[in-house]
């Protein structure tokens, strides 16, 4: 009676944006915040989102459904967080439910193209200090 659903959960981060991906057996649906990839705006950044799909081919995504929830950050940071979560979800699913050889193949493809598909960028905003308008800039002095 109890049927276990084959699923994995991964996350992607960029600056303050966090994307959580749920990957399970399905028919190839990929949704971000309840919307299909084709309807995401801005359109120029949609190509960045489709990079993992184009790199490994759509046939690898045919038997999985991926739901991604993203929050925080700006538009570009969210797109980068989503693409990282997407790539990591596929690798984790193949590792857990398919085979090790396919997983290693996927990881090598992603790493060769862009390492940020699998590894988060650790850079964060530097905090503002006193004596100036920003983190490093100082207020101008006048000697009169």
From Swiss-Prot:
GO terms for cellular component: cytosolic small ribosomal subunit. The keyword Plastid does not apply. Residues 124-144 are annotated as: Disordered. SUPFAM superfamilies: Ribosomal protein S5 domain 2-like. One of its GO terms (biological process) is translation. GO terms for molecular function: RNA binding; structural constituent of ribosome. InterPro entries: Ribosomal_Su5_D2-typ_SF, Ribosomal_uS9, Ribosomal_uS9_CS, Ribsml_uS5_D2-typ_fold_subgr. The modification N-acetylthreonine is found at residue 2. Keywords: Acetylation, Ribonucleoprotein, Ribosomal protein. NCBIfam families: PRK00474.1. Belongs to the universal ribosomal protein uS9 family. This is Small ribosomal subunit protein uS9.
